[in-house]
């Protein structure tokens, strides 16, 4: 087994909720991360926008709080998801979420 684990904090810019045909609750958020990191002894501005998918009953207690402007920390794994336009994009499937605001 190989490692696929990511922890990222940021601000929710969009969110939506739905249930799958099997009745599983899903929340989908767009997470915006801004920070500064050192790379090769130089300070670098870091900016990321990435979709995060939260699935199943363990997230139902926080789903009402996942709204634009809320700061969160997400821990999960990354995978490719194919959009309706056929383009692949990287997304995070959350295993844990912590509200920061």
Curated annotation (Swiss-Prot):
Q: Does the record's keyword annotation contain DNA-binding?
A: yes
Coiled coil ranges (UniProt) are none
Give an example GO biological process. Answer: DNA replication, synthesis of primer
InterPro entries (UniProt xref): NA-bd_OB-fold, Primosome_PriB/ssb, Prisomal_replication_PriB
Q: Which GO terms describe its cellular component?
A: primosome complex
Q: How does it assemble?
A: Homodimer. Interacts with PriA and DnaT. Component of the replication restart primosome. Primosome assembly occurs via a 'hand-off' mechanism. PriA binds to replication forks, subsequently PriB then DnaT bind; DnaT then displaces ssDNA to generate the helicase loading substrate.
- Record function comment: Involved in the restart of stalled replication forks, which reloads the replicative helicase on sites other than the origin of replication; the PriA-PriB pathway is the major replication restart pathway. During primosome assembly it facilitates complex formation between PriA and DnaT on DNA; stabilizes PriA on DNA. Stimulates the DNA unwinding activity of PriA helicase.
Give the similarity note: Belongs to the PriB family.
Q: What is this protein called?
A: Replication restart protein PriB
Q: To which species is this protein native? A: Shewanella oneidensis (strain ATCC 700550 / JCM 31522 / CIP 106686 / LMG 19005 / NCIMB 14063 / MR-1)
Upper classification of the organism: Bacteria, Pseudomonadati, Pseudomonadota, Gammaproteobacteria, Alteromonadales
């Amino acid at each position: 087994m190989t490692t696929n684990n990511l922890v990222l904090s940021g601000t929710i810019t969009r969110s939506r909720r739905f249930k799958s045909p099997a009745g599983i609750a899903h929340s989908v958020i767009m997470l915006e991360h801004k920070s500064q990191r050192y790379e090769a002894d130089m300070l670098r501005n870091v900016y990321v926008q990435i979709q995060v998918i939260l699935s199943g009953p363990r997230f139902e207690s926080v789903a009402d709080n996942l709204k634009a402007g809320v700061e969160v920390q997400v821990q999960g794994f990354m995978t490719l998801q194919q959009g309706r336009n056929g383009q692949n994009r990287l997304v995070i499937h959350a295993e844990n979420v912590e509200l920061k605001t």
